[in-house]
């Protein structure tokens, strides 16, 4: 199955929390899987790497929880990101989408089954916003 696409907005210094809901059915039964959420720099180096073994990503039957702590987001360097632009992130419950200007990184969300099958579930762009406070 091809990966779905979804973009995210991440504010440096803020906790990043998202819940990804999966389509009902046997493919959503991933509680026993392992997973990773990796945000990549333009040179393919990792800006953020979360795994089910370390922390930051939790797989459930039917949904995935992602959390990047404020300490981790505060340590993100945008020095290797050359692209900037506007990111639009969908909102829940038919609300208007969110948008922000920032540096553009990319990410992949992958899971691995108990039999070793690796599947990329989501890919997209992460808009990294340095500060929303004018100083």
Walk through the language-model features, giving the residues of each.
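N-terminal assembly/attachment segments of tailed bacteriophage virion structural proteins
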Residues: 1-135
């Amino acid at each position: 199955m091809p990966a779905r696409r979804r973009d995210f907005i991440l504010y440096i210094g803020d906790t990043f929390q998202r819940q990804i809901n999966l389509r009902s059915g046997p493919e959503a039964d991933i509680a026993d899987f392992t997973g990773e959420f990796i945000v990549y720099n333009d040179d393919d180096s990792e800006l953020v790497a979360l795994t089910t073994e370390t922390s930051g990503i939790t797989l459930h039957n039917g949904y995935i929880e992602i959390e990047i702590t404020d300490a981790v987001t505060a340590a993100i360097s945008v020095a290797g990101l050359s692209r900037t632009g506007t990111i639009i992130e969908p909102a829940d419950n038919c609300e208007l989408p969110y948008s922000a200007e920032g540096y553009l990184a990319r990410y992949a969300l992958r899971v691995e089954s108990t039999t070793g099958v690796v599947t990329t579930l989501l890919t997209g762009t992460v808009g990294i916003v340095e500060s929303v406070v004018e100083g």
